[in-house]
Curated annotation (Swiss-Prot):
The gene is ahcY. The lineage of its organism: Bacteria, Pseudomonadati, Pseudomonadota, Betaproteobacteria, Burkholderiales. Belongs to the adenosylhomocysteinase family. This is Adenosylhomocysteinase. It comes from Acidovorax sp. (strain JS42). It is found in: Cytoplasm. One of its GO terms (biological process) is L-homocysteine biosynthetic process.
Protein backbone atom coordinates (compact mmCIF):
# COMPACT_ATOMS: atom_id res chain seq x y z
CA UNK A 1 0.00 0.00 0.00
CA UNK A 2 2.60 2.56 1.10
CA UNK A 3 4.77 2.02 -1.97
CA UNK A 4 2.13 3.31 -4.41
CA UNK A 5 0.21 5.75 -2.22
CA UNK A 6 0.53 9.38 -3.26
CA UNK A 7 0.35 12.25 -0.80
CA UNK A 8 -2.97 14.10 -1.22
CA UNK A 9 -2.64 17.58 -2.72
CA UNK A 10 -4.88 19.12 -0.05
CA UNK A 11 -2.63 18.13 2.84
CA UNK A 12 0.82 18.88 4.23
CA UNK A 13 2.40 15.86 5.89
CA UNK A 14 5.93 14.49 6.27
CA UNK A 15 5.67 11.15 4.49
CA UNK A 16 2.60 9.39 3.10
CA UNK A 17 4.50 6.08 3.13
CA UNK A 18 4.05 6.06 6.92
CA UNK A 19 0.28 5.60 6.53
CA UNK A 20 0.29 1.81 6.92
CA UNK A 21 2.25 2.03 10.18
CA UNK A 22 -0.10 4.73 11.40
CA UNK A 23 -3.16 2.64 10.56
CA UNK A 24 -1.82 -0.30 12.58
CA UNK A 25 -1.32 1.92 15.63
CA UNK A 26 -4.77 3.47 15.18
CA UNK A 27 -6.30 -0.02 15.36
CA UNK A 28 -4.50 -0.65 18.65
CA UNK A 29 -5.60 2.73 20.01
CA UNK A 30 -9.23 1.97 19.16
CA UNK A 31 -9.13 -0.97 21.56
CA UNK A 32 -8.00 1.42 24.31
CA UNK A 33 -10.56 4.14 23.57
CA UNK A 34 -13.93 2.65 24.59
CA UNK A 35 -15.63 6.02 24.96
CA UNK A 36 -15.11 7.06 21.36
CA UNK A 37 -15.95 3.62 20.01
CA UNK A 38 -19.18 3.51 22.04
CA UNK A 39 -20.15 6.95 20.73
CA UNK A 40 -19.61 5.72 17.17
CA UNK A 41 -21.86 2.74 17.85
CA UNK A 42 -24.56 4.88 19.47
CA UNK A 43 -24.66 7.74 16.98
CA UNK A 44 -23.37 6.50 13.61
CA UNK A 45 -26.82 5.63 12.27
CA UNK A 46 -28.26 8.99 13.38
CA UNK A 47 -25.44 11.02 11.77
CA UNK A 48 -25.81 13.95 14.21
CA UNK A 49 -22.85 15.79 12.66
CA UNK A 50 -24.07 15.52 9.06
CA UNK A 51 -23.53 18.98 7.60
CA UNK A 52 -20.91 19.91 10.19
CA UNK A 53 -17.70 21.34 8.76
CA UNK A 54 -15.19 21.07 11.59
CA UNK A 55 -11.91 22.95 11.69
CA UNK A 56 -9.70 20.98 14.07
CA UNK A 57 -6.61 22.44 15.74
CA UNK A 58 -5.32 19.76 18.11
CA UNK A 59 -2.17 17.62 18.43
CA UNK A 60 -2.09 15.27 15.41
CA UNK A 61 -1.44 12.04 17.28
CA UNK A 62 -2.65 8.46 16.96
CA UNK A 63 -5.31 9.19 19.58
CA UNK A 64 -6.45 12.26 17.66
CA UNK A 65 -6.75 10.10 14.56
CA UNK A 66 -9.38 8.04 16.41
CA UNK A 67 -11.19 11.28 17.31
CA UNK A 68 -11.12 12.49 13.70
CA UNK A 69 -12.51 9.21 12.42
CA UNK A 70 -15.22 9.31 15.08
CA UNK A 71 -16.30 12.79 13.95
CA UNK A 72 -16.35 11.58 10.35
CA UNK A 73 -18.31 8.45 11.29
CA UNK A 74 -20.95 10.76 12.76
CA UNK A 75 -21.23 12.67 9.48
CA UNK A 76 -18.78 15.55 9.81
CA UNK A 77 -16.47 17.00 7.18
CA UNK A 78 -13.11 17.68 8.83
CA UNK A 79 -9.91 19.64 8.14
CA UNK A 80 -7.11 19.28 10.67
CA UNK A 81 -3.85 20.85 11.84
CA UNK A 82 -1.74 20.31 14.93
CA UNK A 83 -1.83 22.93 17.68
CA UNK A 84 1.89 22.55 18.43
CA UNK A 85 4.90 22.51 16.12
CA UNK A 86 6.49 19.48 17.81
CA UNK A 87 3.50 17.31 18.80
CA UNK A 88 2.58 15.67 15.48
CA UNK A 89 3.12 11.95 15.05
CA UNK A 90 3.91 11.81 11.35
CA UNK A 91 2.57 8.29 10.88
CA UNK A 92 -0.76 9.35 12.39
CA UNK A 93 -0.97 12.33 10.03
CA UNK A 94 -0.17 10.09 7.08
CA UNK A 95 -2.82 7.54 8.00
CA UNK A 96 -5.53 10.21 8.18
CA UNK A 97 -4.38 11.97 5.00
CA UNK A 98 -4.49 8.62 3.20
CA UNK A 99 -8.23 8.41 3.85
CA UNK A 100 -8.79 11.73 2.06
CA UNK A 101 -9.13 13.93 5.13
CA UNK A 102 -7.10 17.14 4.70
CA UNK A 103 -4.31 17.19 7.30
CA UNK A 104 -1.68 19.88 7.76
CA UNK A 105 0.78 18.70 10.38
CA UNK A 106 4.49 17.84 10.37
CA UNK A 107 6.57 17.16 13.47
CA UNK A 108 9.09 19.99 13.74
CA UNK A 109 7.29 22.32 11.33
CA UNK A 110 8.31 25.98 11.43
CA UNK A 111 6.13 28.67 12.96
CA UNK A 112 5.62 30.08 9.46
CA UNK A 113 4.29 26.68 8.39
CA UNK A 114 2.21 26.42 11.56
CA UNK A 115 0.24 29.59 10.87
CA UNK A 116 -0.06 28.74 7.17
CA UNK A 117 -1.54 25.36 8.11
CA UNK A 118 -3.88 26.96 10.65
CA UNK A 119 -5.20 29.22 7.89
CA UNK A 120 -5.65 26.30 5.50
CA UNK A 121 -7.93 24.34 7.83
CA UNK A 122 -10.54 27.09 7.37
CA UNK A 123 -10.79 26.63 3.58
CA UNK A 124 -13.66 24.23 2.98
CA UNK A 125 -15.28 25.53 -0.22
CA UNK A 126 -15.17 28.17 -2.96
CA UNK A 127 -15.06 31.84 -1.99
CA UNK A 128 -18.52 33.21 -1.31
CA UNK A 129 -20.19 29.80 -1.17
CA UNK A 130 -22.42 28.68 1.69
CA UNK A 131 -19.85 26.06 2.62
CA UNK A 132 -16.79 28.25 2.18
CA UNK A 133 -15.60 27.91 5.76
CA UNK A 134 -16.22 25.79 8.84
CA UNK A 135 -19.34 25.96 10.93
CA UNK A 136 -17.58 24.43 13.95
CA UNK A 137 -14.13 24.72 15.55
CA UNK A 138 -12.53 22.03 17.71
CA UNK A 139 -9.65 23.82 19.40
CA UNK A 140 -6.78 23.04 21.76
CA UNK A 141 -5.07 26.11 23.18
CA UNK A 142 -7.27 28.54 21.28
CA UNK A 143 -5.04 29.33 18.30
CA UNK A 144 -7.71 28.65 15.66
CA UNK A 145 -10.19 30.76 17.61
CA UNK A 146 -7.59 33.49 18.12
CA UNK A 147 -6.85 33.57 14.39
CA UNK A 148 -10.48 34.28 13.51
CA UNK A 149 -10.85 37.01 16.13
CA UNK A 150 -7.56 38.76 15.50
CA UNK A 151 -7.93 38.55 11.73
CA UNK A 152 -11.43 40.01 11.80
CA UNK A 153 -10.25 42.88 14.02
CA UNK A 154 -7.36 43.53 11.65
CA UNK A 155 -9.75 43.86 8.71
CA UNK A 156 -11.12 47.00 10.36
CA UNK A 157 -8.01 48.21 12.20
CA UNK A 158 -4.59 47.17 10.92
CA UNK A 159 -2.93 48.79 13.93
CA UNK A 160 -3.73 45.70 16.05
CA UNK A 161 -0.89 44.03 14.12
CA UNK A 162 1.59 46.86 14.60
CA UNK A 163 3.40 45.82 17.75
CA UNK A 164 4.15 42.08 18.10
CA UNK A 165 5.31 41.10 21.57
CA UNK A 166 7.26 37.99 20.59
CA UNK A 167 8.76 36.21 17.61
CA UNK A 168 5.68 34.01 17.32
CA UNK A 169 3.42 37.07 17.30
CA UNK A 170 5.60 38.61 14.61
CA UNK A 171 5.10 35.54 12.44
CA UNK A 172 1.36 35.37 13.18
CA UNK A 173 0.86 39.06 12.42
CA UNK A 174 2.81 38.71 9.16
CA UNK A 175 0.61 35.75 8.16
CA UNK A 176 -2.56 37.76 8.82
CA UNK A 177 -1.22 40.75 6.87
CA UNK A 178 -0.40 38.49 3.93
CA UNK A 179 -3.86 36.94 3.97
CA UNK A 180 -5.54 40.36 4.11
CA UNK A 181 -3.45 41.57 1.18
CA UNK A 182 -4.70 38.56 -0.77
CA UNK A 183 -8.34 38.69 0.44
CA UNK A 184 -9.45 41.65 2.57
CA UNK A 185 -12.62 40.01 3.96
CA UNK A 186 -11.37 36.44 4.43
CA UNK A 187 -11.65 36.42 8.23
CA UNK A 188 -15.08 38.01 8.48
CA UNK A 189 -16.51 35.63 5.87
CA UNK A 190 -15.09 32.57 7.60
CA UNK A 191 -16.09 33.63 11.12
CA UNK A 192 -19.64 34.51 10.05
CA UNK A 193 -20.39 30.84 9.34
CA UNK A 194 -19.11 29.47 12.66
CA UNK A 195 -21.75 28.22 15.11
CA UNK A 196 -19.40 27.49 17.98
CA UNK A 197 -16.12 26.22 19.36
CA UNK A 198 -15.26 23.44 21.78
CA UNK A 199 -12.01 24.03 23.67
CA UNK A 200 -9.76 21.27 24.98
CA UNK A 201 -7.31 22.85 27.37
CA UNK A 202 -6.86 25.28 30.25
CA UNK A 203 -4.96 27.90 28.25
CA UNK A 204 -7.60 28.04 25.54
CA UNK A 205 -10.37 28.32 28.13
CA UNK A 206 -8.58 31.32 29.67
CA UNK A 207 -8.62 32.97 26.26
CA UNK A 208 -12.32 32.23 25.73
CA UNK A 209 -13.32 33.54 29.14
CA UNK A 210 -11.28 36.69 28.64
CA UNK A 211 -13.00 37.40 25.31
CA UNK A 212 -16.41 36.57 26.77
CA UNK A 213 -15.85 38.98 29.68
CA UNK A 214 -14.91 41.74 27.22
CA UNK A 215 -17.92 41.02 25.02
CA UNK A 216 -15.74 40.20 22.01
CA UNK A 217 -16.27 36.43 21.71
CA UNK A 218 -17.85 35.82 18.29
CA UNK A 219 -19.17 32.29 18.87
CA UNK A 220 -20.85 30.01 21.35
CA UNK A 221 -18.25 28.03 23.29
CA UNK A 222 -18.12 24.86 25.35
CA UNK A 223 -15.28 24.51 27.83
CA UNK A 224 -14.40 20.83 27.51
CA UNK A 225 -11.38 21.21 29.80
CA UNK A 226 -13.48 21.66 32.93
CA UNK A 227 -15.56 18.55 32.42
CA UNK A 228 -14.58 16.37 35.36
CA UNK A 229 -13.82 13.44 33.06
CA UNK A 230 -11.33 15.66 31.23
CA UNK A 231 -9.54 17.77 33.83
CA UNK A 232 -9.40 15.15 36.59
CA UNK A 233 -8.28 12.43 34.19
CA UNK A 234 -6.37 13.81 31.19
CA UNK A 235 -4.73 16.61 33.16
CA UNK A 236 -3.88 14.49 36.20
CA UNK A 237 -3.61 10.83 35.21
CA UNK A 238 -2.44 11.55 31.67
CA UNK A 239 0.39 13.81 32.84
CA UNK A 240 1.25 11.31 35.56
CA UNK A 241 2.27 8.85 32.85
CA UNK A 242 3.41 11.01 29.94
CA UNK A 243 5.67 13.53 31.73
CA UNK A 244 8.33 11.09 32.86
CA UNK A 245 8.02 9.18 29.59
CA UNK A 246 8.99 12.36 27.73
CA UNK A 247 11.85 13.20 30.09
CA UNK A 248 13.32 9.69 29.98
CA UNK A 249 13.03 9.32 26.19
CA UNK A 250 14.81 12.65 25.82
CA UNK A 251 17.59 12.22 28.37
CA UNK A 252 17.79 8.61 29.66
CA UNK A 253 18.33 10.23 33.04
CA UNK A 254 17.85 8.39 36.34
CA UNK A 255 14.97 10.09 38.15
CA UNK A 256 15.57 8.40 41.50
CA UNK A 257 17.63 10.48 43.88
CA UNK A 258 17.19 13.69 41.90
CA UNK A 259 15.53 16.84 43.24
CA UNK A 260 12.67 17.82 40.95
CA UNK A 261 10.76 21.11 41.08
CA UNK A 262 7.18 21.18 39.80
CA UNK A 263 5.93 24.72 39.19
CA UNK A 264 2.20 24.73 39.89
CA UNK A 265 0.02 22.28 41.78
CA UNK A 266 -3.17 22.23 39.75
CA UNK A 267 -4.34 19.01 38.14
CA UNK A 268 -1.35 18.90 35.76
CA UNK A 269 1.05 19.73 38.59
CA UNK A 270 -0.48 17.09 40.85
CA UNK A 271 -0.04 14.39 38.22
CA UNK A 272 3.50 15.52 37.45
CA UNK A 273 4.52 15.59 41.12
CA UNK A 274 3.05 12.12 41.71
CA UNK A 275 4.93 10.73 38.71
CA UNK A 276 8.30 12.09 39.79
CA UNK A 277 7.79 10.91 43.36
CA UNK A 278 6.80 7.44 42.13
CA UNK A 279 10.26 7.17 40.57
CA UNK A 280 11.82 8.21 43.90
CA UNK A 281 12.70 11.79 43.12
CA UNK A 282 12.59 14.30 45.95
CA UNK A 283 9.83 16.61 44.72
CA UNK A 284 9.43 20.28 45.56
CA UNK A 285 6.48 22.41 44.47
CA UNK A 286 6.12 26.12 43.77
CA UNK A 287 2.68 27.73 44.04
CA UNK A 288 0.99 31.15 44.11
CA UNK A 289 -2.30 29.88 45.53
CA UNK A 290 -2.34 29.20 49.29
CA UNK A 291 -4.94 26.45 48.92
CA UNK A 292 -2.92 24.54 46.33
CA UNK A 293 0.25 25.18 48.32
CA UNK A 294 -1.37 23.68 51.41
CA UNK A 295 -2.58 20.69 49.38
CA UNK A 296 0.98 20.07 48.21
CA UNK A 297 2.33 20.35 51.74
CA UNK A 298 -0.32 17.93 53.05
CA UNK A 299 0.75 15.41 50.39
CA UNK A 300 4.30 15.60 51.71
CA UNK A 301 5.82 17.87 49.07
CA UNK A 302 8.14 20.67 50.12
CA UNK A 303 6.66 23.99 48.98
CA UNK A 304 9.34 26.48 47.96
CA UNK A 305 9.91 29.43 45.64
CA UNK A 306 11.67 29.15 42.31
CA UNK A 307 14.25 31.67 43.51
CA UNK A 308 15.11 29.43 46.47
CA UNK A 309 15.14 26.21 44.44
CA UNK A 310 16.90 27.34 41.27
CA UNK A 311 20.46 26.54 42.35
CA UNK A 312 19.56 23.35 44.24
CA UNK A 313 17.33 21.17 42.04
CA UNK A 314 18.18 18.86 39.14
CA UNK A 315 14.92 18.80 37.16
CA UNK A 316 12.45 21.64 36.60
CA UNK A 317 8.93 21.20 35.20
CA UNK A 318 6.45 24.04 34.56
CA UNK A 319 2.74 23.19 34.65
CA UNK A 320 1.02 26.53 35.25
CA UNK A 321 -0.33 27.98 32.00
CA UNK A 322 1.25 31.29 33.04
CA UNK A 323 4.21 33.18 31.58
CA UNK A 324 7.76 33.72 32.86
CA UNK A 325 7.51 31.00 35.50
CA UNK A 326 11.15 30.09 34.95
CA UNK A 327 13.08 33.24 34.07
CA UNK A 328 16.49 33.75 32.54
CA UNK A 329 17.78 34.69 36.00
CA UNK A 330 16.48 31.41 37.42
CA UNK A 331 18.27 29.47 34.70
CA UNK A 332 21.50 31.41 35.21
CA UNK A 333 21.44 30.18 38.82
CA UNK A 334 20.80 26.50 37.96
CA UNK A 335 23.30 23.67 38.26
CA UNK A 336 25.31 22.51 35.29
CA UNK A 337 23.23 19.93 33.35
CA UNK A 338 19.95 20.84 35.05
CA UNK A 339 16.99 19.61 33.00
CA UNK A 340 14.32 22.21 32.20
CA UNK A 341 10.98 21.39 30.60
CA UNK A 342 7.35 22.44 30.33
CA UNK A 343 4.10 20.49 30.28
CA UNK A 344 1.84 23.55 30.08
CA UNK A 345 0.42 24.48 26.69
CA UNK A 346 2.71 27.30 25.54
CA UNK A 347 6.48 27.81 25.62
CA UNK A 348 6.32 31.19 27.38
CA UNK A 349 6.28 29.52 30.82
CA UNK A 350 10.06 29.43 30.33
CA UNK A 351 11.91 32.50 29.04
CA UNK A 352 13.21 30.69 25.96
CA UNK A 353 13.53 33.90 23.94
CA UNK A 354 16.11 35.24 26.39
CA UNK A 355 18.06 31.99 26.18
CA UNK A 356 18.13 32.40 22.40
CA UNK A 357 19.33 35.98 22.80
CA UNK A 358 22.06 35.45 25.40
CA UNK A 359 23.24 31.84 25.11
CA UNK A 360 24.70 29.40 22.62
CA UNK A 361 22.63 26.38 21.61
CA UNK A 362 23.83 22.90 20.77
CA UNK A 363 21.29 20.39 19.49
CA UNK A 364 21.81 16.96 21.02
CA UNK A 365 18.97 15.43 19.02
CA UNK A 366 15.58 16.71 17.86
CA UNK A 367 13.84 18.54 20.74
CA UNK A 368 16.81 18.11 23.11
CA UNK A 369 19.23 21.04 23.35
CA UNK A 370 22.20 22.03 25.42
CA UNK A 371 21.88 25.73 26.24
CA UNK A 372 25.37 27.07 26.98
CA UNK A 373 25.74 30.15 29.17
CA UNK A 374 28.64 32.61 28.81
CA UNK A 375 30.42 31.04 31.81
CA UNK A 376 30.36 27.62 30.12
CA UNK A 377 27.57 26.13 32.22
CA UNK A 378 25.03 24.04 30.32
CA UNK A 379 21.40 23.26 30.98
CA UNK A 380 19.33 20.72 29.04
CA UNK A 381 16.18 22.26 27.56
CA UNK A 382 13.54 19.85 26.29
CA UNK A 383 11.22 20.54 23.34
CA UNK A 384 12.45 24.15 23.26
CA UNK A 385 10.12 24.87 26.17
CA UNK A 386 7.03 23.47 24.48
CA UNK A 387 5.07 20.43 25.63
CA UNK A 388 7.66 17.89 26.73
CA UNK A 389 5.31 14.92 26.77
CA UNK A 390 4.38 15.42 23.11
CA UNK A 391 7.63 16.96 21.87
CA UNK A 392 9.87 14.28 23.39
CA UNK A 393 7.33 11.48 23.82
CA UNK A 394 4.02 10.41 22.34
CA UNK A 395 1.72 12.20 24.77
CA UNK A 396 -0.97 10.74 27.00
CA UNK A 397 -2.07 7.10 26.78
CA UNK A 398 -5.03 6.28 24.55
CA UNK A 399 -7.37 5.33 27.38
CA UNK A 400 -7.25 8.66 29.17
CA UNK A 401 -7.55 10.52 25.87
CA UNK A 402 -10.73 8.58 25.20
CA UNK A 403 -12.22 10.43 28.17
CA UNK A 404 -11.20 13.82 26.80
CA UNK A 405 -12.17 13.13 23.22
CA UNK A 406 -15.52 11.61 24.18
CA UNK A 407 -16.23 14.96 25.83
CA UNK A 408 -15.10 16.79 22.70
CA UNK A 409 -17.34 14.70 20.47
CA UNK A 410 -20.37 15.13 22.71
CA UNK A 411 -19.71 18.88 22.92
CA UNK A 412 -19.53 19.12 19.12
CA UNK A 413 -22.85 17.28 18.85
CA UNK A 414 -24.43 19.54 21.48
CA UNK A 415 -23.39 22.82 19.87
CA UNK A 416 -24.10 21.71 16.31
CA UNK A 417 -27.51 20.16 16.95
CA UNK A 418 -28.77 22.51 19.69
CA UNK A 419 -27.22 25.95 19.04
CA UNK A 420 -30.37 27.62 20.33
CA UNK A 421 -29.52 26.37 23.82
CA UNK A 422 -26.24 28.28 23.91
CA UNK A 423 -25.85 32.06 23.69
CA UNK A 424 -23.29 33.57 21.33
CA UNK A 425 -20.39 35.02 23.28
CA UNK A 426 -20.81 32.82 26.35
CA UNK A 427 -18.71 29.90 27.60
CA UNK A 428 -20.47 26.78 28.90
CA UNK A 429 -19.51 23.43 30.39
CA UNK A 430 -21.24 20.16 29.56
CA UNK A 431 -24.03 19.22 31.96
CA UNK A 432 -23.26 16.77 34.75
CA UNK A 433 -25.26 13.88 33.25
CA UNK A 434 -23.05 13.92 30.14
CA UNK A 435 -19.91 13.98 32.29
CA UNK A 436 -21.20 10.91 34.12
CA UNK A 437 -22.05 9.27 30.78
CA UNK A 438 -18.44 9.63 29.63
CA UNK A 439 -17.25 7.97 32.84
CA UNK A 440 -19.75 5.10 32.45
CA UNK A 441 -18.46 4.37 28.96
CA UNK A 442 -14.99 3.65 30.37
CA UNK A 443 -15.78 1.51 33.43
CA UNK A 444 -16.01 -1.86 31.70
CA UNK A 445 -12.55 -1.49 30.16
CA UNK A 446 -10.96 -1.22 33.62
CA UNK A 447 -13.10 -3.97 35.13
CA UNK A 448 -15.06 -1.62 37.38
CA UNK A 449 -18.46 -2.68 38.76
CA UNK A 450 -20.85 0.15 39.60
CA UNK A 451 -23.10 -0.11 42.65
CA UNK A 452 -26.74 0.83 42.03
CA UNK A 453 -28.82 2.83 44.49
CA UNK A 454 -32.03 1.36 45.82
CA UNK A 455 -35.16 3.50 45.64
CA UNK A 456 -34.87 4.13 49.37
CA UNK A 457 -31.22 5.13 49.15
CA UNK A 458 -31.86 7.50 46.24
CA UNK A 459 -34.72 9.12 48.13
CA UNK A 460 -32.65 9.37 51.31
CA UNK A 461 -29.85 11.38 49.69
CA UNK A 462 -32.13 13.17 47.24
CA UNK A 463 -30.67 12.14 43.89
CA UNK A 464 -32.13 10.31 40.87
CA UNK A 465 -31.27 6.61 40.74
CA UNK A 466 -29.55 7.08 37.37
CA UNK A 467 -27.84 10.35 38.28
CA UNK A 468 -26.60 12.99 38.21
CA UNK A 469 -25.22 12.07 41.61
CA UNK A 470 -23.38 15.23 42.59
CA UNK A 471 -24.17 18.96 42.49
CA UNK A 472 -22.25 21.11 40.03
CA UNK A 473 -20.28 22.55 42.95
CA UNK A 474 -18.86 19.14 43.95
CA UNK A 475 -15.07 19.11 43.49
CA UNK A 476 -14.22 15.40 43.14
Amino acid sequence: MSAVLKSPADSAIADISLADWGRKEIRIAETEMPGLMAIREEFAAKQPLKGARITGSLHMTIQTAVLIETLKALGADVRWASCNIFSTQDHAAAAIAATGTPVFAIKGETLVDYWDYTHRIFDFGPKGSEGEGPNMILDDGGDATLLMHLGKRAEKDASVLAHPGSEEERILFAAIKAKLAEDSTWYSRKSAQIIGVTEETTTGVHRLKEMSAKGTLLFRAINVNDSVTKSKFDNLYGCRESLVDGIKRATDVMIAGKVAVVAGYGDVGKGSAQALRALSAQVWVTEIDPINALQAAMEGFKVVTMEWAADKADIFVTTTGNRDVITFEHMKAMKDQAIVCNIGHFDNEIQVAKLEEHCQWEEIKPQVDHVIFPDGKRIILLAKGRLVNLGCGTGHPSFVMSNSFANQTIAQIELFTHPEGYDVGKVYVLPKHLDEKVARLHLKKVGAMLTELSDEQAAYIGVPKQGPYKPDTYRY
